[in-house]
Amino acid sequence: VAQVIALVGTGLSTIALALLAYNMAGSEAGRVLGIALACKMIAYVFFAPIIGGVIHRLSRKSFMITMDILRAFIVLLMPFVSEIWHIYLLIFLLNFFSAGFKPVFQAVIPDILEDDEQYGKALAYSRIAYDLENILSPTLAGIGLLFFSYTGLFVFNSVAFLISAVIILFTILPKSKHVERSGNVLNEISYGMKAYFKTPRLRSLLVLYIGIALASSMIIVNTVIYVKDYLGETDSSLALLFAFSGLGSMLMAFLYPKLAKIMNDKTITQLGIIILSISLFYMSIEPSLIFALSAWFLVGIGLSLSQIPSGKIVNMSANPKDRTAYFTAQFSLTHLCWLIGYLAAGELVLLFGFGFTAIFFGCIVVFCYLYSVLFWPDEDSQNILLHKHKNIVHTHTHDHDPHHEHHNHPIETTHEHEHHHPEVVHKHPFQIDLHHQNWPKH
């Protein structure tokens, strides 16, 4: 519920930001919006890994509530913007705090829902919430704009963040698992990134996110330019295109639990990428509102199919104790893709036009798909790999588990002492962690 309320509020601000950029920059609104969203991505890319490295030392509930309150304050400042650089600064600060909230929220979900099927449904429902925002926000924005200026939408977003904070305050969250990690704070901050890049399926997923980001950027950055300058339509058409994209995405979110029973997550993700490439080529057709509605609908379908499984893919790749570090790495790296996408979408359309940019992005998406076909391992359906552990003696905090079955220490809770791991060859669901620092080579 907190997510839905915050998302609807954010959706109102997204539309208000597009209108604010157009009012201040005119035909260069795409460039202004692209740079503003790049500021958002910079905050995501550089702040999220820091949170991933230290969040296990903090209360997750208190942290998320604090982030919501700070976001509410920043959004309230939006109506007072008078210079373009004000937009850039406030967008950076707003998303500096969002970069703390979102990956922690994502990592909490599998702690609450440990069953894989239920977690998959939760991801689908989360996507539905996101898509309801795409559908409801333009509608609510359109109604709101009949009675007040777009600056009022920022006020509604601020209230939404405060409501989200109150809901989280009264929500019971499970205690986070103890983290088995050695080293200083810098090592902890970089841990998630290192583990992410050592996992083949996650490297392939990241390449696919390049394609996802490019398709998404065309929608987010250039819809206002496409509607105003290419179609000559009004603000209502802008809201309509966003709504059609949300409808396509929500349709696939409803169907995902059924698809997951007959297709694996790798196949579903790749199918989404194929649809995104088709939709980008489709966008290059002569500008028409009818063509645009169908193209935006296809993009929504592709974005939903390609992104919903990512949570399960990251979750299966991570030791539960390291889950937040993996999710923050995923959050940071994928938003780096969006950073590049936003800048490229704004500049290329301005320099070469909408049609050329759509075709160029479509070709890159095809390349991303081919990479995943070649380098995403097939054994991921089970994630059980044969591997060898070297003989080692070390010290770190740990619990008694299959890798720590010694009984020379009486404490059954988390404890720390020097202990020995003999050389062993075995197989089990494999994740990069303190005791599995490199992916097995076959």
Region annotations inferred by a language model:
Residues 1-14, 36-55, 59-74, 86-146, ...:
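Substrate-agnostic recognition of the 12-TM MFS/MFS-like secondary transporter fold
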Residues 16-25, 78-80, 136-156, 229-230, ...:
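Transmembrane alpha-helix termini and helix-breaking/packing motifs in multi-pass membrane transporters
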Residues 69-83, 274-287:
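C-terminal ends and interior cores of transmembrane alpha-helices
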Residues 107, 111-112, 154-184, 374-384:
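Helix-loop junctions on the cytosolic side of multi-pass membrane transporters
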Residues 266-307:
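C-terminal transmembrane helical hairpin of 12-TM major facilitator-type secondary transporters
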